[in-house]
């Protein structure tokens, strides 16, 4: 399944709300993925791998199954760089993701609203900039 098959509200309104709120944080640059906006399949692959590899922090929302998202998470896993994985409260998440998080000793972050995601990312960003590590 592709993320493009996620509910319209999630793909547009919710993602836009999260991205807009994250963009206004200090020291944050949003690396947008091409998605369906254009380019060839190879362009999308190369761009998404570059973004996933380059970013100081990747934020993944995993409540809607997506093969591409899974590939991006695994790419990020191999970089050994920080990532935050979110799922809406009460949503099931594949054991492949929960097992990876357990191995990394990292929590699956639950949220009820876009504001919850932004708050946790901002806390991580602040801790990262201060050099104290990720907040619990």
PLM ranges: what are they?
Residues 1-136:
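Conserved catalytic or regulatory cores that recognize and/or transform ribose-phosphate-containing ligands
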């Amino acid at each position: 399944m592709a993320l493009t098959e996620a509910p319209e509200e999630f793909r547009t309104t919710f993602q836009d709300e999260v991205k807009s709120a994250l963009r206004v944080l200090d020291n944050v640059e949003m690396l947008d993925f091409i998605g369906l906006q254009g380019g060839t399949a190879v362009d999308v692959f190369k761009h998404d791998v570059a973004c996933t590899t380059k970013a100081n922090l990747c934020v993944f929302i995993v409540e809607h199954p997506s093969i591409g998202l899974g590939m991006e998470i695994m790419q990020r896993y191999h970089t050994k760089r920080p990532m935050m994985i979110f799922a809406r409260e009460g949503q099931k998440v594949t054991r492949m993701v929960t097992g990876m998080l357990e191995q990394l000793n990292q929590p699956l972050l639950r949220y009820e609203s876009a504001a919850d995601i932004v708050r946790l990312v901002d806390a991580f960003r602040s801790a990262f900039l201060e050099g104290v590590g990720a907040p619990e």
